[in-house]
């Protein structure tokens, strides 16, 4: 049986070493030389590096196979050796398909080290190939590369957008380990042995541990904000842990082949124009970095049209990471961004709807299209360096936290179109099951996801669908086709969130098997008509459009339904399988209507009880309780849920059978307290609209006589904060780190007051929780009932957010400003405490808190 690609989904199970040059048996090749790796081959140096490390020995025939794909078993061997993992000769991995094979002990070693995982079904696929995205994921994990990233990650390759490996690939790009291929990154392409050797060697040289006994440094210079250049001997023996810099730490080191020079990558940017002490083992050096901008390039990026937190990116000089505007300001440089449409007219794409900016931050809600953006960097009192680039604005994936509801619809018209987010048309119908018949086609009719804390129908352009088996169900532009009998899982993705839907494809054509009536027991007054909704379904539970010939109505001999008085047809466009039909009471009595197919098999039934048409009672009742004679009309109306409630004057027979609503022409309705609520007659209904909390009597009269009465209690029940979900935080060790409310609480930015996520309330509400952004009431949390993003009359105060520093803190630049709390400096050490309180003036009203510890590395008290 052919292998599936299920192991490719196990990103975390595809290890880094698997991408390195392959070993298909533990037979050694002679020396470094491989006949199929000629001198000058682009990966020769990396292959030789791994040979020197004892990580690879080649294939049994003495070749290397640089163009062949690497398998996972061979990778386990290489990974074990490159990391010097302990190997138990008798060890067996937990994977059932990797036991008692030549590489078992190596697979066991990397599994024990936490480097690899299987597919979740006890499989490892030792002979399986590895794609570039899976490689990137494990390379990042094995060498802890995420902690070594400098600056924000930016997606520069369009084929990475929405891909599961987007972040991991961007980390490799950020660190200079990968540069893509021909304008693409090709995340799904299998990695060759030569490519694997190149990636592993580059990474190990920069981030692998080394013996530093023979290293000696003669000079240290800051070559760029995040780089040190060391000169000396034996520098190839140094590791990043051997280098320290005040206020920062080294995260990687890359030495020249002869060990006479090395480039050190720092975790942050050095302070400009300041004497800095650098220590390499037991040696100490003082250096200063004077920043000079010589070259500038605007990154050609694609941005989302309505996403907050986006900014123009540009690179300076030959630095790999993106430039930092705040850092440039510290280095006595001013930055200006100028945006124009392609015709040269100003483009108001920056925050505040401006065409120029000093931060490069984009507005939310930008018109889609291409724009020209010029970045100007000017040294104060000196020259200006500038560059213009093109950026693209599109509707990219929607940031979602959960996929709540997925509805597929069958394209029964076979026209290649299924309405999305709206009523279906023609013969198309929504699927209740996950069953398809061979040859059927379907697509999404609706997908609801939680976006910014609110359940919304997702834009179809933000959705991607992949099939686990294209031979069973194929997918083209999210349009699925049942190709053959079997099972396949559709993985639906919105942003970084996925949901799996398992479909079964059969060869059993759809047929009508059920007719259900709602209600299935009908009490109706003679000569009156009441609605009955009929639902017709097939053997899978999906809607079935039944025409006149499909259903035979067998009427009871009691005559409760007249001959020809009922014809169940459910083929109306847009509502296949469902039809509401008026059933008229004929003769007084009772009986059951049976529904049969052409073969006489019973599909369902409807019991009908027809009573005499005398109106004995009239009952003033809630529309929501029509037909429930004797129920009290008194009710409670919560203004936080709805502002209106409806009544009608219902007619009942002497048997308490509901007939129909009374015509209210000639009737009058009165609210006895207009300050609390008013009441109006609208058609055959009385509509009561609440204004303010209190009780009010509603009287319905005709010619002065009371026809109905109800008491409505208007309430506005208290909503309070039940708990708070704070963001996880880490100790801040570096300078120039900004700490504010956004450090501990997830915010959805707004030009006015921001929405605060993670505030759990005592009752559900459709209104947003916001925080006052500025002014005397900064930090006030409130329920924005009118949705205007400003606290005013009618909104509900929920509590306050505050920030303070502990008494033992040494944070001289601390401000009790939630949006500008602290920018860390070289001697900062202490703790900031963010609290959510019911009342900021009552310290015992705390609901929750989150502490942020600050401990900058060069603090003299450490």
UniProtKB/Swiss-Prot annotation:
<keyword id="KW-0134">Cell wall</keyword>
<feature type="domain" description="SLH 1">
    <location>
        <begin position="30"/>
        <end position="93"/>
    </location>
</feature>
<feature type="signal peptide">
    <location>
        <begin position="1"/>
        <end position="29"/>
    </location>
</feature>
<dbReference type="InterPro" id="IPR051465">
    <property type="entry name" value="Cell_Envelope_Struct_Comp"/>
</dbReference>
<dbReference type="Pfam" id="PF00395">
    <property type="entry name" value="SLH"/>
</dbReference>
<dbReference type="GO" id="GO:0045229">
    <property type="term" value="P:external encapsulating structure organization"/>
</dbReference>
<feature type="domain" description="SLH 3">
    <location>
        <begin position="152"/>
        <end position="214"/>
    </location>
</feature>
<keyword id="KW-0677">Repeat</keyword>
<keyword id="KW-0964">Secreted</keyword>
<keyword id="KW-0701">S-layer</keyword>
<feature type="domain" description="SLH 2">
    <location>
        <begin position="94"/>
        <end position="151"/>
    </location>
</feature>
<comment type="function">
    <text>The S-layer is a paracrystalline mono-layered assembly of proteins which coat the surface of bacteria.</text>
</comment>
<protein>
    <recommendedName>
        <fullName>S-layer protein EA1</fullName>
    </recommendedName>
</protein>
<dbReference type="InterPro" id="IPR001119">
    <property type="entry name" value="SLH_dom"/>
</dbReference>
<dbReference type="GO" id="GO:0030115">
    <property type="term" value="C:S-layer"/>
</dbReference>
<dbReference type="GO" id="GO:0005576">
    <property type="term" value="C:extracellular region"/>
</dbReference>
<dbReference type="GO" id="GO:0005198">
    <property type="term" value="F:structural molecule activity"/>
</dbReference>
<keyword id="KW-0732">Signal</keyword>
<dbReference type="GO" id="GO:0141018">
    <property type="term" value="P:adhesion of symbiont to host via host extracellular matrix"/>
</dbReference>
